[in-house]
């Protein structure tokens, strides 16, 4: 007797912030390639900077706390030192000059800035810049010294703490424990950049050995990911230096640190020995975010070179795994309900945490040949098969119109099935092989159905599944209860001047660190009070959350799509992540900023998330970017951010990582920066453009 399936189509999923109905997403077979798991090498981080932790010691001769060290300068154009601390920056004094300068220990005068007392060397006077470094509402003061046309070679840097800090118990304890009291970000804008990445996204699980790769390369030879001339799986050619070493400084979720060597021996996933590509392994045993700094040192033309990248690597457990068995049954509308049987390795019960599932679906044509039908995807959770307490399945639904549209029938097959963690979009289990779909019950040939509208018309129900009745009943029934919602970003307060927008309301989830899914859930819950629907004007990560919401869950945004106007408009959103997220994880934790790290904002996290967003949902987004003004000797929104981001940028996200492929790009405004406290006004305070967004919104 055939095993019968309980119809486990997930109608609603209970979340912490209310009950949401996930969409049963589907799309054309021509879109299959858009959902491939990204190659980490394609989103590798590249920079010409390095980050140092400064641990002071007590000088018996001077009766002071100080740090002295040598910093290599390899740029002939510019050299910048930027400092961060949990203590007031005015409590430190900095001296810096080339070792070749005969007057390196002498000083002419003291320049008093907002933060530092800077000793100006007789040799050369730096440009002093004060700023606010960070992401959205999570920031810390920064102080930068920039030398134009510096002497190439080793520089002596001496940092001295003030007498008041010597009496500070917290400072004294950090000195005793050798905990860095200060961070120094060094930028050498030159052709020599570090390039680093994890080798795979498929093993980011506890108990695994995660491989990390790094090299130096020439920026002038770099082909950007956005370039049409970039070959598939391209990576730059390594620069070979002398006296080379590489290491990883790993911050574990429990706060401890490890230093791990990297090797160019061909035995650490680093391809060939002595080819300039270094590899190393991280053994992960804890759940959570790992703060990783990759440090590369060497000598080029007799001068020292040091570069580092900061990564944030989320580690989860492999709590669900595909077994390879797939079953299906038709529902009352002849739609194909597909069930992917799963188990939970090393667990006695199957984990029912909501996940993201994706699969390609194939059928059979009149000649008995396999034919691609469509892809299916959505948020779901493992549910038991009827009559079993141990066999669980994830579900997806394929609208019967997709099958009829390509003239297919049973038997059916699935391929490239992916199950991903909903918080990180780390692949939990995936298979590239083809699996037969076992049909439960008799299959009704949908080609015999008379379809209206005609099959060439792709309906919203085909793409999203059936809208919940309580939403569907409100379509076209206006009661005057619709709103434009203004949303902030990561760890932020209100950023939009509400007086610039008509019929608007401010979303207030202030000073919180949310992943995209949690952020989207809270937005949906807030918007549910507007029974006619709502639209969104979003800043920074608010744009990611808005796109996540309209993609995966039914909400008032779906009611608004029936009306004229824009449903989602965003400003300064890091759709492809920001390299600042990894660096901020290192700096933010060191200086004690309240909001913790957010892996959804990293370039890796964004790449994993973005591959799950279909083209029709991207097309709903109208986005705008900004950048610093140009024409000055030094152009920046935040000078410290320039050391981490591509140029140009808005101080948080660069113009290389703001594009949303398939979205509607509107404009890039100069002389507007991401956040308050930067070199130019905050991008959300552009009143003229705010009023334009208001007039173009649905509500």
From Swiss-Prot:
Region: Disordered; residue ranges are 680-699
The positions flagged as glycosylation sites are: 130, 283, 346, 430
At the highest ranks, the source species' classification is: Eukaryota, Amoebozoa, Evosea, Eumycetozoa, Dictyostelia
Its GO biological process annotations read:
aggregation involved in sorocarp development; positive regulation of cell differentiation; regulation of gene expression
InterPro entries in the cross-refs? AB_hydrolase_fold
Q: Where is the signal peptide?
A: 1-18
- Per UniProt, which keywords does this protein have? Glycoprotein, Signal
What exactly does this protein do?
Involved in cell density sensing and might synchronize the onset of development by triggering aggregation when a majority of the cells in a given area have starved.
What GO cellular component is one of the record's annotations? extracellular space
What gene is behind this protein? cmfA
Q: What is this protein called?
A: Conditioned medium factor
The organism is Dictyostelium discoideum
- PTM notes: N- and O-glycosylated. The N-terminus is blocked.
């Amino acid at each position: 007797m055939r095993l019968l399936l309980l119809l486990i189509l997930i109608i609603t999923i209970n979340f912490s912030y209310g009950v949401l109905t996930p969409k049963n997403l589907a799309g054309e077979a021509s879109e299959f390639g858009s959902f491939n798991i990204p190659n980490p090498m394609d989103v590798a981080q590249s920079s010409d900077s390095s980050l140092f932790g400064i641990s002071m010691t007590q000088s018996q001769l001077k009766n002071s706390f100080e740090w002295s060290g040598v910093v290599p300068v390899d740029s002939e154009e510019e050299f910048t030192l930027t400092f961060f601390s949990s203590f007031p920056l005015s409590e430190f004094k900095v001296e810096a000059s080339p070792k070749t300068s005969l007057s390196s220990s002498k000083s002419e005068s003291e320049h008093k800035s907002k933060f530092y007392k800077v000793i100006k060397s007789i040799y050369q006077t730096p440009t002093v810049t004060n700023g606010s470094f960070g992401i959205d509402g999570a920031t810390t003061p920064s102080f930068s010294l920039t030398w134009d046309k510096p002497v190439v070679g080793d520089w002596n840097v001496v940092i001295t703490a003030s007498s008041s800090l010597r009496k500070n118990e917290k400072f004294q304890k950090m000195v005793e424990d050798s905990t860095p009291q200060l961070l120094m970000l060094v930028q050498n804008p030159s052709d020599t950049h570090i390039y680093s990445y994890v080798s795979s996204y498929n093993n980011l699980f506890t108990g695994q050995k995660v491989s990390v790769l790094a090299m130096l390369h020439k920026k002038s030879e770099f082909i950007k990911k956005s370039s049409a001339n970039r070959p598939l799986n391209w990576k730059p050619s390594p620069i070979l230096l002398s006296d080379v070493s590489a290491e990883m400084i790993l911050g574990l979720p429990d706060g401890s640190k490890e230093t791990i060597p990297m090797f160019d021996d061909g035995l650490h996933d680093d391809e060939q020995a002595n080819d300039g590509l270094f590899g190393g392994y991280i053994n992960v045993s804890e759940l959570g975010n790992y703060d990783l700094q990759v440090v590369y040192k060497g000598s080029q033309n007799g001068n020292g070179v040091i570069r580092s990248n900061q990564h944030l690597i989320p580690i989860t457990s492999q709590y669900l795994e595909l077994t390879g068995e797939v079953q299906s049954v038709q529902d009352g509308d002849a739609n194909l309900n597909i069930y992917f049987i799963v188990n939970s390795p090393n667990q006695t019960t199957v984990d029912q945490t909501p996940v993201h599932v994706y699969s390609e679906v194939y059928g059979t044509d009149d000649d008995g040949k396999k034919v691609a039908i469509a892809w299916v995807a959505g948020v779901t959770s493992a549910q038991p098969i009827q009559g079993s307490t141990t066999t669980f399945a994830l579900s997806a639904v394929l609208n019967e119109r997709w099958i009829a549209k390509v003239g297919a029938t049973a038997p059916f097959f699935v391929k490239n099935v992916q199950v991903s963690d909903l918080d990180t979009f780390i692949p939990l289990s995936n298979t590239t092989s083809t699996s037969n779909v076992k049909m439960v019950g008799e299959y009704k040939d949908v080609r015999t159905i008379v379809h209206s509208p005609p099959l060439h018309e792709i309906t919203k129900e085909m793409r999203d599944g059936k809208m919940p009745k309580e939403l569907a009943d409100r379509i076209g029934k206006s009661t005057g209860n619709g709103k434009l919602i203004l949303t902030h970003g990561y760890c932020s307060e209100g950023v939009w001047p509400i007086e610039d927008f008509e019929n608007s309301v401010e979303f207030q989830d202030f000073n919180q660190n949310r992943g995209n899914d949690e952020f989207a859930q809270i937005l949906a819950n807030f918007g549910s009070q507007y029974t006619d629907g709502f639209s969104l004007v979003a800043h920074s990560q608010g744009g990611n959350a808005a796109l996540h919401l309209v993609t995966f869950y039914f909400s008032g945004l779906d009611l608004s799509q029936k009306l004229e106007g824009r449903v989602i408009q965003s400003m300064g959103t890091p759709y492809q992540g920001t390299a600042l997220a990894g660096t901020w994880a290192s700096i933010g934790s060191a200086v004690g900023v309240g909001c913790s790290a957010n892996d959804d904002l990293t370039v890796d996290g964004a790449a994993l998330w973005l591959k799950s967003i279909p083209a029709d949902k991207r097309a709903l987004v109208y986005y705008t970017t900004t950048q610093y003004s140009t024409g000055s000797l030094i152009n920046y929104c935040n000078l410290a951010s320039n050391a981490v981001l591509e140029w140009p940028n808005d101080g948080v996200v660069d113009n290389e990582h703001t594009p949303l492929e398939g979205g509607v790009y509107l404009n890039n405004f100069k002389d507007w920066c991401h956040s308050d406290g930067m070199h130019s006004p905050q991008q959300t305070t552009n009143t003229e453009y705010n009023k334009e967004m208001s007039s173009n919104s649905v509500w």
